[in-house]
Swiss-Prot record:
InterPro entries named in the record: AB_hydrolase_fold, CarbesteraseB, Carboxylesterase_B_AS, Carboxylesterase_B_CS
Protein's recorded name: Esterase-5C
Keyword Hydrolase tagged: yes
Protein localization: Secreted
Family per similarity comment: Belongs to the type-B carboxylesterase/lipase family.
Pfam families documented for this protein: COesterase
Organism: Drosophila persimilis (Fruit fly)
Amino acid sequence: MLAARLIILLSFYWLSASAIDPADPLFVDLPHGKIRGRDNGFYYSYESLPYAEPPVGELRFEAPQPYKQQWTDTFDATQPPVTCMQWNQFIFGDNKLAGVEDCLTVSIYKPKNTSQSSFPVVAHMHGGAFMFGEARQNGHENMMREGKLILVKISYRLGPLGFASTGDAGLSGNFGLKDQRLALLWIKQNIASFGGEPENIIVVGHSAGGASVHLQMLREDFAQVAKAGISFGGNAMDPWVIHQSARGRTFELGRIVGCGQASDSTELKNCLKSKPAGEIVSAVHSFLVFAYVPFAPFGPVVESPDAPEAFISQHPVDIIKSGKFAQVPWAVTYNTEDGGYNAAVLLEKQASSGRELIFDLNDHWFDWAPYLLFYRDSMTTIKDMDDYSRKLRQEYLGDRRFSVESYWDLQRLFTDILYKNATELALDLYRKHGKSPVYAFVYDNPANTGIGQFFSKRTDVHFGTVHGDEYFLIFENLARGPEMRSDEEIISRNFLNMINDFVVSGNGTMTFGNCVLQDNVGSNKFQLLSITKNGCENLQLESFP
């Protein structure tokens, strides 16, 4: 079905061949009518362009449908994209509900660069654990100032609205991934109208956005919509990506919002369609053990093979082993202290006691660890969970107690389990089963402020190079300070050039500064580029450090 839709959409490709009117580049003709963008000084923007019918009413919990409306008036593309409805971790306070249900849009940003008649294209998928986040959370001005690339930001369904699943055809799930896929088809079809090069599209994302890129690339037909991908700080091997107990969680969601009488998936879906979207999304708080833990109670699933328009029907590990995935260039990354994103909240001082939350782990480790580290659903018995929890604690802390002094070892545990080990696994699978180039880098250059300070609400702790420290040099984010150091400015420019050169490369080569990344496919050792404030260095490793 998805392949048929691709053929139908691409058959209309000629409709988007009309160029931007050189007399007024703010106006663009699309198959749905004319749009008007905005002049932002050194770039143009065309925001909030719908690529799908609103996923409301009978279209809630269904695969997205291509946008059909024809505009009689000029469409106002000057309004920033709305937030897809979510229970947002970044909102402090009890009520974390934000956004709207009708949110499936793309937003396009084009630099003013008269020396280029056309531009390679970066399709961007935001992060947020598949639960929260939005197209606006990452800036675009760094990329626009470089003046070499068109950027397209994709909005997609999140949380239970995007990923509730009963594991069968009745409520199959992965609606957020299917949104992303339809958006990529829209970009392929229409980007030429904005001066973009449809033959030179790369997909990038961070965290859940990086995992989304990887999941999109696990479809064999990915090469029909893009030529390469980069997964920053997240990939499909991460333990928080594929959910194994979605069915029970989705029926529990139904019970919470008043659909407990549903006897099967179809009844449950129909009942959930009748409930207010805000009520469904607000139910997320019932799945949290403490704070925002687990940070991804809903997410991608392996769908039943008989599900309508199934996105994936095998586990990513099995897909890669089968060789039936898109053989196109891919890069995957991690940071040396990625786990600070998840662990930093444990250093927040509690208002009631003035004591850090990390001390509570001494009494609650066996209860909380399976949720913090995402093995609650993969263990069959409580004994298995307790044994694994005990093993991890002994391996990383020995006989020491959880405390501020032992925080760095706990953060190292989080980094390994939630990010680094999965990157090593992905590379190992690709070097054995891949055919196109696969690259990897590790970033070690702490930002002055970042996610660690944000979630701990502290400035007196050094967290190292945490989640996002590299990505926010490409796409600005308020979690890190607005200013870049001189070394970060150089690194930012090298990252932007890396992306540009990767997308236009005819043979999939990748460079960073004066370093050429080495291909992992067919290699006996891991080929890993190390990036620090002092430059870059190619490493050949038996295992990750």
